[in-house]
Amino acid sequence: MAREFSLAKTRNIGIMAHVDAGKTTTTERILYYTGKIHKIGETHEGASQMDWMEQEQERGITITSAATTAQWDGHRVNIIDTPGHVDFTIEVQRSLRVLDGAVTVLDSQSGVEPQTETVWRQATEYGVPRIVFANKMDKIGADFLYSVQTLHDRLQANAHPIQLPIGSEDDFRGIIDLIKMKAEIYTNDLGTDILEEDIPDEYLEQAQEYREKLIEAVAETDEDLMMKYLEGEEITNEELVAGIRKATINVEFFPVLCGSAFKNKGVQLMLDAVIAYLPSPLDIPAIKGVNPDTDAEEERPASDEEPFAALAFKIMTDPFVGRLTFFRVYSGVLNSGSYVMNTSKGKRERIGRILQMHANSRQEIETVYAGDIAAAVGLKDTTTGDSLTDEKAKIILESIEVPEPVIQLMVEPKSKADQDKMGIALQKLAEEDPTFRVETNVETGETVIAGMGELHLDVLVDRMRREFKVEANVGAPQVSYRETFRASTQARGFFKRQSGGKGQFGDVWIEFTPNEEGKGFEFENAIVGGVVPREFIPAVEKGLIESMANGVLAGYPMVDVKAKLYDGSYHDVDSSETAFKIAASLALKEAAKTAQPAILEPMMLVTITAPEDNLGDVMGHVTARRGRVDGMEAHGTSQIVRAYVPLAEMFGYATVLRSATQGRGTFMMVFDHYEDVPKSVQEEIIKKNKGE
């Protein structure tokens, strides 16, 4: 079957926001107006189309980014719903990686909130064009112009309204289109009867002022428009729309719209804006990658004629069809039943069936084309971030960066029967979510799970119970500490054993130096003249990696260390890989005596919003928790405090803040960086770990 929609008429968009800004409801309405749903599901009734996992419906938050496809105005719009809660940032990152544009949803009462900043920053890193939808205009305290101001103040975004609201809160009844200079009046809350009228007299002056500001802002991004504007010539609506589109796609300008998804107002106009201002796959630069055979950089322009190249961005286990791999096609065409090359793993995979998803129903299709987003059944080895390409034209596309987990819990099955089931369940969950790690403590045999935050692990333990019917006891959350060296040193590792039969002999000299933060472990072989034979070099590296998994101070993984093997000796008969592995680990232990080993702890960026009267309490909380305040700003009668606080001190803070502010204070935290723990704390940690 031929393509239904041309590339120019395809939009791949994400909907991103702070938790509770009304993102899922907005997506719902889009699906409703584009004819994919017959009855609207409300998030607060727990029956939304996109939130299809049971826990999402209970908690009223979106956890997994469901990809769905819809049609509007002769275009295909593929939508990826992204979670707004910080514990699920990997979900946001991996969806941003495969999008061409996004709609940022704000709560008009609060404007830009902490998580909006996080997602906005990630979208800027990936160069994603955005339009902004100020939602919840019907809410008490909704203030459209205040929301626009927060985009400037908190995100330094060049954002300008292309619409103005008529009325707000209960009186929100229409929208002024600053391009057509017309008013859309809603006569009911179903969004079915819309009247296009002239702008009401009392709003005319404000509309003219903001249209002028809009034209000026767009003209600043385009020389031709600037010349016309300065010479006082009239800029036509077509030129204005083209100017906004170009500036938005270049990520130089962000159009701001308003509405209330819950009351069905403004959603159709927002869909029009998605088509008008967000890019098609043809409008963005061709994706780049590396040819695994030649190491040369290559690109894949969006075209059906090019060789097939796609990126797997999500794995899901579906109760009916098993393992689903969501992928974005960048170039070429793929038919079900064909073979592709997973260039990231170097494995050939067969595509069983191809499904196009709509929230949680699915339609089987034969072929996907460049620019499409679909899910494949039957891929065995593919994980998040892998490239899938034509076997004859291999390319590895840029992958998705995965943040390290910062919090861990011990889990143990309640019965022997649960033991095996738990292993399978954890493995499946880890396949779906790369920020979730499962480790078995070799000494104690305990299973430890690690993730991005308490909610993240709660949800996973909950899924284990529901989807895999595994009952487990969960320990208290623990911080994922790390260890490192703070000084350079040289150390010898010498291992010799003679006890009848074949002996063991390994001798190495290694120079250890601190590495840059986040660079991990780097090994360099500087052996000259074969004093350590080449076949034993990998054993030295392996020995170091294995001993660094349990650090020298308190057994935490070591990070950010460079090791240079520069001298050593060997024995013709007795040297072996095992002997050199042991020698390397002895060198590490020896180095620890002089390399100033340190324990690192995760520092969280904490944003606390509390009534002004409680500001003193909040500052006290931060200092008492070894934190440092980074900045403050007033927001109505509240104060917003940003601070860096060690994760170890944040457990149970929700209860403390709640009682100090009579339930009016809230806080959000997101991992920021690792930092040395103070000496006194370090000694406590070592004592606790040795005493166990």
Swiss-Prot record:
It comes from the Bacteria. Residues 8-282 form the tr-type G domain. One of its GO terms (molecular function) is translation elongation factor activity. SUPFAM superfamilies: EF-G C-terminal domain-like (SSF54980), P-loop containing nucleoside triphosphate hydrolases (SSF52540), Ribosomal protein S5 domain 2-like (SSF54211), Translation proteins (SSF50447). Pfam families: EFG_C, EFG_III, EFG_IV, GTP_EFTU, GTP_EFTU_D2. Keywords: Cytoplasm, Elongation factor, GTP-binding, Nucleotide-binding, Protein biosynthesis. One of its GO terms (cellular component) is cytoplasm. One of its GO terms (biological process) is ribosome disassembly. It is found in: Cytoplasm. GTP binds at residues 17-24, 81-85, 135-138. InterPro entries: EFG_II, EFG_III, EFG_III/V, EFG_IV, EFG_V, EFG_V-like, EFTu-like_2, G_TR_CS. Belongs to the TRAFAC class translation factor GTPase superfamily. Classic translation factor GTPase family. EF-G/EF-2 subfamily. Catalyzes the GTP-dependent ribosomal translocation step during translation elongation. During this step, the ribosome changes from the pre-translocational (PRE) to the post-translocational (POST) state as the newly formed A-site-bound peptidyl-tRNA and P-site-bound deacylated tRNA move to the P and E sites, respectively. Catalyzes the coordinated movement of the two tRNA molecules, the mRNA and conformational changes in the ribosome. This is Elongation factor G. It comes from Streptococcus equi subsp. zooepidemicus (strain MGCS10565). The gene is fusA.
